[in-house]
Every structure is written in structure tokens, then in C-alpha cells.
Amino acid sequence: EAEMTKAIQEGKPFYLNMSHYAVHQPFEADHRYLDKYKDSGKGHMAEAFATLVEGMDKSLGDLMQYLEDQGVAENTLILFLGDNGGDAPLGGPADYGSSAPLRGKKGSEYEGGVRVPFIAAWAKPDAKNKFQKKYPIAQNAVQLQQGTVMDLYPTILSVAHVKPPKHYALDGADLKKLFQGKEDKKHRDDFLMHFPHGEHRANYFTTYRKGDWKLIYYYH
């Protein structure tokens, strides 16, 4: 917070990367919210997981309130996403549980192990804001085209109107059209996941997804 406050006071842009560890094993309950879930019937571990999700949500809410209080919410882009498939203690690696309605969970070869939540929004939408006019984001919309973490770097550069260093190879692409709720026919629709190094809730595998199709190859 101190670094952001300093940047705001100096009229400089800032970048904050906030990685929550809370929604991760071991699932130690956040006791601020435990009473809300004690009669869920889902078991102690699942109840603990739910409190961690709510705690993370509270943390993000606090951050957004800080941006509002500092008067920079309209100028701040928030990208909220997971780093892997769901890991809630609900069902096994190949079940429709922690990532329902997707099958599988963290470490599995199924969509529930690969696809993650990804929300992009201005902290305070304002159609008249000069930054939001240059980089509009559709509200209350779901984008079905895929994006990956590799797309974040070129997207952030685009928002900031910064060009990458000359001869610097980019693996990703700007998500601007996708954020607008439009189809980007130039955006890649294939994705390769190569995981033959060791077992983590699944077999040794490689998966390749193209459009609505997915190929899974098992090494044994």
C-alpha cells in the first residue's frame, strides 16, 4: 500500500502483482467466516476452503476500496485470475467436483485442471474516462475465446501504450478485442499442455486443444 500511495502522490503509474496463497493447501480455515459454513454438510475441509475464498474476496474488496478512496479507481485496470484448475476438496481428479461444471481439478488433464476464472475490469467503470475510452472493456459479458497467462504481458503493455523492447519475442497477444466482447479471428485458438514429468493426480500426459476439440495422449 505504501508503494501505491507514493506513486499516486507523485502522479506516477503503478503496477501491483498480488498473489494470494490462502486458497491453497493446507486448507486452514479463516475463522472470521467459519460460522457461515459450519452447517453446509460438505465436510470440514470444504468449509475451510469456503472461508479462504471469502477471505480472498474480502482482500480484493479492500484493495478496490483503497483505489476508490485514493481517487484512482477509474484509471486502474484489474485482472483477476487463477493460476491453475480448481483445488477445492470436492471430488477426485477426474470427477465433476471442485471445478464443476468442468471435469477434473488442479493437475488433471481435463478442462477443470486447465481452465481458470479470468475477470478483467476497470476498478470503477466510467465511459467518459480517457483511459477507458482507449481501452474499453465490455461489462456483464462472457468471452468464450480463450486467453492464457502469456497474453497478460502484451495486454498490459497495450493498456499502458508501451512498446516491448526491439527484437523481444512475445509468446502472447493483446487481448483488447476479447476484452471488448468481440471476436478476434487472429487470436490463437489452440493450446498445448505437456506434462510427462511425473504423476500429480493424473497419468503422464500431453493434451492439445483446438477450438472445441481436445486430444489427450497418455504415456502409460
Regions found by a protein language model. Name each.
Residues 86-111, 126-131, 135-141, 145, ...:
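C-terminal cap/loop subdomain of S1 sulfatases and analogous C-terminal strand-loop tails that border
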Residues 13, 19-20, 55-94:
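Metal-dependent active-site segment of extracytoplasmic phospho-/sulfohydrolases and closely related
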Residues 9-16, 72-78, 114-116, 186-189, ...:
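Loop/turn elements at helix/coil->beta-strand transitions in domains of secreted/extracellular proteins
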Residues 115-119, 153:
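Structural micro-motif
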Residues 1-8, 50, 57, 61-64, ...:
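Non-transmembrane alpha-helical segments in soluble domains
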Residues 18-22, 30, 81-84, 114, ...:
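Active-site-proximal beta-strand/loop segments in catalytic clefts of secreted hydrolases
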Residues 46-54, 142:
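Short acidic-aromatic active-site loops that bind/stabilize oxyanions
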Residues 2-49, 87-93:
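Active-site His/acidic residue clusters
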